[in-house]
Amino acid sequence: DPSQLLRPNAPILPKPPALVCTMMLPDILICFLLNPVGSPSVLAELLFMFHIVSVSGWLILCLCVLSWRGAMIEAEQGTEPHPSAHRKETARPAELQGPAPLQPVAFKRVERVEAVREAFRHAWKGYRTFAWGHDELKPVSKTYGEWFGLGLTLIDALDTMWILDLKEEFEEAKRWVETELSFSKNVDVNLFESTIRILGGLLSTYHLTGDTLFLDKAKDIGSRLMPAFNTPSKIPFSDVNIGKGTAHPPRWTADSTVAEVTSIQLEFRELSRLTQDPQYQKAVDEVTRRVHRLDGKHDGLVPMFININSGKFTHRGVFTLGARADSYYEYLLKQWLQGGKKEAALLEDYLQAVEGVKRNLLGQTSPSKLIFVGELSHGRLNPKMDHLVCFLPGTLALGAHNGLPADHMELAVQLMETCHQMYAQMETGLSPEIVLFNLKDPAGRDIDVKPADRHNLLRPETVESLFYMYRFTQDHKYQDWGWEIMQSFNKYTRVPSGGYTSIGNVRDPVNPGPKDKMESFFLGETLKYLFLLFSDDPELVSLDKFVFNTEAHPLPIWPSTS
């Protein structure tokens, strides 16, 4: 039974005994303060307390007594130290000054950061063993899947490894990029997906490392994607053959999705800035200008499809912040930030769209009064929300941080609670792909899920927004919510041989139904945002210096002279 592959050896990560003992130190010190050190009863109680925890407790007891006599010993700050870390020498009795012991919150932070590193290593072990150089790992069947045949998972994960300080894994992946990665292939790629994952990943890794290998590869793939823009309307084709230099729409339609053609701008603009070749930015800026002028919007909201021949919106009357439209709104704000807040049309479109969301798409559940973003279909609100929409709290918070209206942050807080509940109200603690909200029955559940929508693809949008919310508020509840999600990933999606798998039913903790696929964005986005959420270091990819593309690849905010 494939589902049983997820059960063994996949517990919620426990606190190591030494960490548990260390976190008891404040109570033990109070006992010493309130009672004579030589009191037999107190010593007996302490010895018993440590004995029942673990043998490690005896070591902590010795440290505790030593600290009482004046020598400060720094507690070990991690559940699994990085291989490059060096243990400090024990202080001599004469060296009485030193750092204060870590408080419980700091211990919690270290534990969580190390848990993300361990999760990445486990996922990478599966990819390295069963799918090396291929696009995606199929962890249950211990094989791989191909989409473009370009090592998507490896490229998507490069900057994550750098940020997590996994230098050994990074160097091995870099060698593959240097010796094996070639874009001279007769293969069709999706313009949007290859831009955000491959071009974005290479540009980000170049900026983090300074290694021109990644910039050279970025130039190569960027130039090969340019035939997509050879259309009558300048709205790009969805697919490009990077070997032949040809492009075409999907086989079933002449339309492209609005999100796909308006969520490639950060990457191509940055490529022009680095190469001093204006063709890339010129192509994507023309798309932005044309969409800015188009008829068919509703209070700043855009339809989901656009025709590559006419350059006009199609399937009008349906408006969503979910699939096919989501990152259009995200990139309005982020392009404005990337360019130094100088492009007024981008800000105008973004602010108008947020007002459109508030006027047309917001609903409230009957039981718990959760605020959600629904879909507008020909004037009627549908209480349906994709997990993808959970990018919005983070985007709203980012805008508010950069001087946009304070009520954007108020809405972000409300929507963040709703996205949290999409996880918390499921039996596995993991969100489904799509939910329906209860508007009528106050005695019912806030959230319902159709059987076809109960899958979880290891998506990043909620933990992405948790990262932004914590960075800007320092409210630890957002870290706690992220930790709950991390634990649920470990419990229900972790495969013992290596990797994590999408699951088919978040409502069934007994048989969640492994789907045997680890999307590249689990390493490129989900684990990266979890690590940044738990890191507590605002300078680790500073949001005042970088803007993340929609695949979580940080690109620099341009200097004022750009």
Role assignments for model-derived ranges:
Residues 1-21, 34, 44, 50-54, ...:
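Glycan-recognition and catalytic cores of secretory/periplasmic carbohydrate-active enzymes
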Residues 23-25:
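Compositionally biased intrinsically disordered regions enriched in polar/charged residues
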Residues 28-29, 41-49:
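N-terminal secretory signal peptides that target proteins for export/translocation
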Residues 36-39:
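Compositionally biased, intrinsically disordered low-complexity segments enriched in Pro/Arg/Gln/His
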